[in-house]
Regions:
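Active-site environment of divalent metal-dependent phosphoester hydrolases
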Residues: 149-151, 181-186, 246-248, 287-293, ...
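N-terminal, active-site-proximal structural segment of metallo-dependent hydrolase catalytic domains
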Residues: 1-164, 175-179, 378, 393
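Solvent-exposed, polar/charged alpha-helical surfaces in well-ordered, non-transmembrane soluble domains
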Residues: 128-136, 154, 158, 188, ...
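Metal-dependent phosphoester-hydrolase catalytic domains
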Residues: 1-6, 19, 201-215, 222-223, ...
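Active-site metal-binding loops of divalent metal-dependent hydrolases
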Residues: 12, 147, 243, 285-286, ...
Length: 393
């Protein structure tokens, strides 16, 4: 008989590969990501006006794609121009600085192509340590943030998360729905054999066309509590999310985007409650603090409860009060969440932050981490994992 379920949330910061730009200092990375997003947006224009062409050339210059289409072997290159059909640019041969490059395509119909971010493979020890975090947390259901895609996540679990007694995958149920992020930073879920997914629903299309609410998605994953438990046959819904980042600056547009995402997630949650679903978890990386205006619709204006209020609660640092979930775990870095509906909060019997996969400080000495992490680049993630136990007896 299943007497307890453990649920976790973990931003793995990609499993096998990650955009090279994200390894740069934040101002550099933010500029590259903005240029990448904007130039692809301009490519979709029906007509390339002189102003559009001028902006394209400036963005391609910032991405170092004026003189050629990019070369992944050059460590200073962060993007590649993919050209499938037609011609976008005229590049004179004797033009070392690219000042003579022109846009010759008249609009979207004249050519097919886009700009991709170059990805680098993640350190092998970091990958192994990511698996170790998930194994040691020991959750039955894990909400995953920043996974490349379903096949990558399945390959990760099938090779690194095996039952030592049977050699079977600990998490045979793996799902990632491709979201709205072009960089391959999606959200997904893992579950054990005792908790197969009953159904799922995506929210990638919430909002008007061209103005999607969610940066990735807010998928609903539905499960049934197992036979023999106190909640046998009843439904459990897990919502996984990754709100707009503060990366590159917390400007008013960024705050407004997160608030809109928070409000939409709250609306999805409230609709489920109205439909009679009692047992709901909302989790993920919300990229803002509990006192932020952006998260108010979700944290204040619903009856969801943060697991930080569950007792006993282990913050992952035996010596300090460390409520944060990112980096050094300070109060201002509490950006990851695991929220419970009232019925689940009433059954919660313990929760915590698992930060042994995080480096912590300049020298990795702020709090205990795995002995297999000998340098910062070997850390599993900059994010700690969150977990909660729910009594099913």
């Amino acid at each position: 008989m299943v007497q307890q379920i453990r649920i976790a949330s973990y931003n793995v910061e990609n499993l096998f590969s990650r955009p090279r730009a994200l390894n740069q200092p934040e101002p550099v990375a933010a500029a590259i990501l903005r240029a990448h997003a904007r130039v692809n947006e301009l490519f979709e224009q029906e007509v390339y006006t002189p102003a559009v062409k001028a902006e394209m050339l400036q963005l391609l210059k910032e991405l170092k794609l004026l003189r050629d289409d990019g070369d992944a072997t050059r460590t200073s290159t962060f993007a590649i121009l993919r050209r499938i059909r037609g011609r976008l640019l005229r590049r004179p041969q004797n033009d070392p600085d690219g000042s003579q490059v022109t846009v010759v395509a008249s609009g979207r119909s004249a050519w097919t192509g886009w700009v991709d971010l170059i990805k680098d493979r993640i350190d092998e020890k970091a990958i192994t340590n990511t698996a170790r975090v998930i194994r040691e947390v020991g959750a039955d259901i894990v909400g995953i943030v920043e996974a490349e895609d379903r096949l990558t996540l399945a390959r990760f679990t099938d090779s690194l998360l095996l039952d030592p007694a049977t050699a079977d995958p600990i998490y045979p149920h793996v799902m990632v729905i491709d979201g709205n992020d072009p960089r391959g930073i999606d959200v997904g879920i893992l579950s054990t054999a005792a908790f197969p997914m009953a159904r799922m629903r995506s929210h990638i299309d919430d909002g008007l066309f061209g103005d999607r609410v969610f940066s990735r998605d807010c998928p609903e994953y539905w499960f049934a509590f197992p036979a023999g438990s106190a909640l046998a046959g009843q439904q459990l819904v897990v919502l996984v999310n990754h709100f707009k980042s503060k990366f590159g600056g917390n400007n008013p547009a960024s705050v407004a985007r997160r608030k809109r995402q928070s409000k939409q997630t709250a609306d999805i949650y409230n609709a489920l409650r109205t439909a009679g679903v009692e047992h709901i978890v909302v989790l993920g990386d919300f990229n803002d603090t509990p006192d932020s205006e952006a998260l108010r619709p979700l944290l204040v204006e619903t009856d969801l409860t943060d697991i930080a209020s569950v007792q006993p609660f282990d913050d992952g640092d035996p010596d300090e009060d460390r409520p944060g979930t990112f980096g050094n775990g300070t109060r201002s870095s509490k950006i990851d969440y695991l929220l419970l509906s009232p019925s689940l909060r009433a059954r919660a019997n313990g929760a915590g932050i698992f930060r042994k996969g995080v480096w912590g400080g300049v020298n990795g000495t702020l709090f205990p981490h795995f002995d297999t992490i000998e340098a910062e680049h070997q850390a599993a993630s900059d994010h700690a994992a969150l977990y909660v136990g729910i009594d099913l007896d």
